[in-house]
């Protein structure tokens, strides 16, 4: 078959296969055109799920008479004129394909009037190559487009349409998405002549929350965390599901420069931010990212659902840091930047691994306390249970005990679900905080200060639990995994003492040993999806030259080009870190000295996130040599039982 140019009608119908999937995609294209025209009100009327009729009316700028017919031609647009315009797109449309594609598979009527015209004009096209007819019409300033009998000339595609109800659901869902980002526009939707949706303009935060409640539900709107941050030419604003809201909300909307997108990078950043709290596999969010249009390519998907960031890693880290900050402030947690950093010197790394002062445990006193508690009336005991505060946040912490992964029968809520516990987890992840005996023990005591009766009962019960692992001075191989406290600590019995072994500390110690074993031969650097660029200091070139062998052993590939430090490869332990801040700090450290291997290992380990589950960590500990196992045991903390019981008695 000879090569030939396709007829315009066939070319338009092929293009319609990408642009016009169903009635919802028609409405998407037409409403976006209305918004590009500056409309502040858009009315949508549909019949039979949009397959019979779609009518879009707006009060935008309108289309001049001379351009009506041209508007229905393929690749005709007013939104881009040059290649430079294509590289900095802020409008929804830019390809000039929508109207031509829609008119090729429907009976389309376009009526419009500009402020300069005394009367309106109407263009009509019926899915054929017949010349477009233009005639006078009555119409206010703005545009109305009617799309009748969608796919009337392509029966095969019409048969693939679902029921009217299903098609309407797709339309309704899309309208929700656009209504959340364009709060300055009044939207209305009618189906078969009956009003269904009406989103009024939202000029204030209160009005926007009303619109948010219409879309995502009242529970989400009332408890949502507001996000608003501007930094270095980028801005992130919107609302985030509160950890206090346990219900799953089907609301996952992310916008880039006003355009709704689906992006795995964004979803990963949101999940990672909530992962620090140990909650939500898929939290709800409505977030809008604004950045220089030159830094994002929107011309990568036929339906414009995806974008490509020129600095993907930087965008990811910006989103992650803003969300972590919002969650921390909401729960009154210390931010990562406020915590002491262990990489400042090898001494601080050693300080972080220091042990804790021992305490004695009075078995008789604990048993006596348990007896006193058991004699309390049920009503008094029930009043000790944690309650939810009116704000939706947890007002107390319930120290739950579990064997393996099963929750202790006396507790339903562990420390991992409370705001203060998240503080502890965040501190540990950044290798800081609670690094001394007084701080670590004071943290546990403060969490239980309001529930000492219940805590004493829990621990007294532990004394009669045969499954508590007895270490007898050393951690033997082959022992079963000990009980869990609040999902974060193992409870060990040593002589007459009960000790808490932090699972995250143990996991971090395993990471340190893993890195220490690999460091002599060198770590394997992983290339970044997008290299990170940082403004370089004058002496960094000298540092890279003098410490070249050290950087190679760590798997770091750094170059300086045009007065910028380009980060190309990093060891896997740093992949989830803020490299633009971390690497410059590291260069300042190694400029002064060549750190010891152990200090380097602790520095890398503190940035590892997503540790293994407790059973796997315990299994790895059991596989170690006795000396290494005992090192981990030494990091366990004695419980100050005598102090707590004395406070209880008084």
Curated annotation (Swiss-Prot):
Keyword DNA damage: yes
GO cellular component, one term: mismatch repair complex
Region of interest (Disordered), ranges: 374-420
InterPro entries, per database record: DNA_mismatch_repair_CS, DNA_mismatch_repair_MutL, DNA_mismatch_S5_2-like, HATPase_C_sf, MutL/Mlh/PMS, MutL/Mlh/Pms-like, MutL_C, MutL_C_dimsub
Biased composition (Polar residues): 392-420
Gene Ontology process terms (BP): mismatch repair
Keyword terms, alphabetized: DNA damage, DNA repair
PROSITE patterns: DNA_MISMATCH_REPAIR_1
CDD domains registered for this protein in UniProt: HATPase_MutL-MLH-PMS-like, MutL_Trans_MutL
UniProt keyword NADP present: no
GO molecular function (one): ATP hydrolysis activity
Function summary: This protein is involved in the repair of mismatches in DNA. It is required for dam-dependent methyl-directed DNA mismatch repair. May act as a 'molecular matchmaker', a protein that promotes the formation of a stable complex between two or more DNA-binding proteins in an ATP-dependent manner without itself being part of a final effector complex.
HAMAP family assigned: DNA_mis_repair
Sequence similarity: Belongs to the DNA mismatch repair MutL/HexB family.
Protein name, entry field: DNA mismatch repair protein MutL
